């Protein structure tokens, strides 16, 4: 992706119901209710399924990923995920 190109100019990388794996540790940035800021929500290598696709700041996609082992649905950016 070039600097002047927005992620939203392209189709989403992941599809609904696609199995994905986390590429990094995900901590609460304050947007996950009931957990303290900085608390671990999911660890690198955990797997889940894309259950929703939204946008962030009109520049990038946010993928709602259901981490079945934890019972959480967390928002992830493309760089935090990989296909299984």
Q: What positions do the PLM features span?
A:
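Basic/aromatic-rich interaction segments and small domains that mediate binding to polyanionic partners
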Residues: 2-84
């Amino acid at each position: 992706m070039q600097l002047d190109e927005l992620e939203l100019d392209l189709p989403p990388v992941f599809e609904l119901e696609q199995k994905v794996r986390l590429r990094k540790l995900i901590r609460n940035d304050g947007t996950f209710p009931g957990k303290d800021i900085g608390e671990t929500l999911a660890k690198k290598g955990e797997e889940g399924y894309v259950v929703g696709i939204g946008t962030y700041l009109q520049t990038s996609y946010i993928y709602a990923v259901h981490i079945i082992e934890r019972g959480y649905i967390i928002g992830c950016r493309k760089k935090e995920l990989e296909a299984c």
